[in-house]
Amino acid sequence: MLIIIQSLLLATTASLCIADTPVPTQIRLVHDLLDNYDKKAKPMWDNSKPINVSFSMDLYQILELNEPQQYILLNAWIIERWFDEFLYWNPDDYENITELRLPYDSIWLPDTTLYNSLVMKDDDTRRLLNSKLTTDTHRRAALIELLYPTIYKFSCLLDLRFFPFDVQVCTMTFSSWTYDQKGIDYFPYSDKIGTSNYLENEGWYILQTKIKRQEVKYACCPNNYTLLQLTLYLRRKPLFYLVNLIIPTSIITLIAIVGFFTTSSASGMREEKVSLGITTLLSMSILMLMVSDQMPTTSTFIPLIGWFILAMIIVISLGTVVSSVIIAIQKRGSLGERMSKRALKFAKVLAWFTCTSLPPHVEKEHMMEAFDAPTPLVEVRPLQLASVKESVRNKWVSGARRATQRGNSGLALISDKSTDPLIHLSPTAHQPDESISPSAPPVPSSSPLPPPLTPGPADDVVSVASELSSKFLTSRMRPKSQKDNTFAAMQSSIKANRQLAVAEFEWFATVVERTCFVIFVVAFLIITFGINFIGFIHWHQAGVEYGG
């Protein structure tokens, strides 16, 4: 019994001691604020009034700007501010405490949402910690400041027409998802995004930032929604693409042009230039694949660097085709046909344009034309001359045989001037030869050849026939060595004519080659500097416009 009485006395004494222990003021303040507080209710005594939420962002780092998928990943710090009328306290009652920290999940929070976010789970986007409460005796409300770090991944429609000299404008849209303007009204705390703690990105400049408030009426809802649009103006740093894409492409194209249109190699032919063109096209296609991997899959536009590489591919393709034509021109000389006068005249103009010297025989003919020197009017090719001689030989052999059979009947060997080629080619076809004269002695009847006929003054045909017959008979009696010399001379003439043709077409191929070299180099310079100059002008003007 005594033990029970002692236990009761100890319990009573302990309770009295606990009751007399003072409770900390801030604990008492928290208990007083949260005892009757419901975080599910909008903290306004007048429910018809909206809660004004102030929003600000301090950009910390741009982590990624993805061109193919067209999104931006960035790290930022967000501060939201609003007044909570249910959490007001009088500092005089709590030892002049004006600030308090409470967990975020113990108070009412606005459901601020990034409308164009690509991440739907809020926990993956922001990390909420504690909120700061500051009592305001004038408004009889507590100012709530919610500061939290975020990693936002949001969509941005990129304009890559001037890539890599492009400027991007990306906008983040914030608002409440459940409250319209009568529930929550958003206001920007500043008209710009803070960049005081920003870490510079290796690929992008920030030209300008802007925050704009906008009221939007949606078809689903009767009241307007207040949106905050935070805009980033970004300009790309093009040095990486200049060094790794544009300059290598330009060098490859220039080397290909030089390889296409330089003089032939030690082998004397140009077939290896086609292989050079095919190899260069393969390397350009690899560069094109590198660019396409960084571009979005779209058919609405072609980026500037795409036009550049495509133009270089066209230049190399045309160079390969022209090299094939030049090879065909060079091989044309092996056929032995000389260039026509019209083609030679055109080649002389191109040679003057490209400062190419003329071949010796062409230069000699050119000088003769300049001084009005006479040139041969008729040019008989060796093959044609041989065929003509063979035809004449056959005709006059048969005629001589007929004349021998007739004896001295006085019939003349008549040649048709309309069918005899040598009559047209000889400048003295209508004049009697000195070897045939009226005073020539007659040929005896025992001779196998008929005596020469005496040409009458009225019969030129008989005179010409007698002349040709005499020449033919004389040639029949020439020794064999003299015939061999004639054949060797004809072969030498054909060989010389072929050598002249080879020299002419080789020279013409060189002239065309140098002309195309000048044209392709000019086209290359215009394309290279023109396209990049257009991109640089756009890049520079964007910096001036947005204050970069």
From Swiss-Prot:
Extracellular topological domain: 21-239
Pfam families the record matches: Neur_chan_LBD, Neur_chan_memb
UniProt keyword Isomerase, yes or no: no
Region (Disordered), start-end ranges: 422-460
Biological function: Subunit of the non-synaptic neuronal acetylcholine receptor (AChR), which may play a role in chemotaxis towards choline. After binding choline or acetylcholine, the AChR responds by an extensive change in conformation that affects all subunits and leads to opening of an ion-conducting channel across the plasma membrane.
Family the UniProt entry places it in: Belongs to the ligand-gated ion channel (TC 1.A.9) family. Acetylcholine receptor (TC 1.A.9.1) subfamily.
Identification of the protein by name: Acetylcholine receptor subunit alpha-type des-2
Source species: Caenorhabditis elegans
Gene designation: des-2
